[in-house]
């Protein structure tokens, strides 16, 4: 089963956009993510609708951040991309009248609800600014010299 990496990928994109400090085209983002610019525009539209990014058309156009990273929580991005399923597992519905299935579903459902609440609370507590700080600490630890990377590419 393939995992849904949209959240991680969009967090990655937003951090690069902050570093780049210029409009980033859908084509640039698509190249970074090895996907189609149409997919990028569709995903970025959710972020735009929530007021985290804006898009400018034209020769020097592209996507830019509207808010500072410190004001965007991971939960904000998760919600803006459509709140993808957190778990691939879930209750069964083959035999809803079966008391065994009901007991199993009750236990699994309760556990998943508790786990989801913990995950969402953590996503709410962490900002993109926190992630940027973690990146900068990791970069400094390398002892690297020269400019920091702006946009990933193949």
Annotate the PLM regions.
Residues 1-33:
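Extreme N-terminal segment that seeds HTH/winged-HTH DNA-binding domains in transcriptional regulators
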